[in-house]
């Protein structure tokens, strides 16, 4: 195998927009993310309501055949 062809790994601090942070290994020393396991609805069990009724009405209004 060839030597010195792989990127150098350093300890990386990953920070989420919710304030959660954790350590990982990466080529960069710092990363910022928008969503993590502490604030993602799948992991927290909370649901986010989506206004699908408004979208359906808008679709029907746009493509209504008179």
Swiss-Prot record:
Binding-site positions, Zn(2+): 16, 18, 36, 39
InterPro entries: Ribosomal_bL28/bL31-like_sf, Ribosomal_bL31, Ribosomal_bL31_A, Ribosomal_bL31_sf
Keywords: Metal-binding, Ribonucleoprotein, Ribosomal protein, RNA-binding, rRNA-binding, Zinc
Any one of the GO CC terms: ribosome
One GO term (biological process): translation
Entry note: cofactor: Binds 1 zinc ion per subunit.
Summary of subunit composition and partner proteins: Part of the 50S ribosomal subunit.
Protein task: Binds the 23S rRNA.
Entry protein name: Large ribosomal subunit protein bL31
Organism: Sulfurimonas denitrificans (strain ATCC 33889 / DSM 1251)
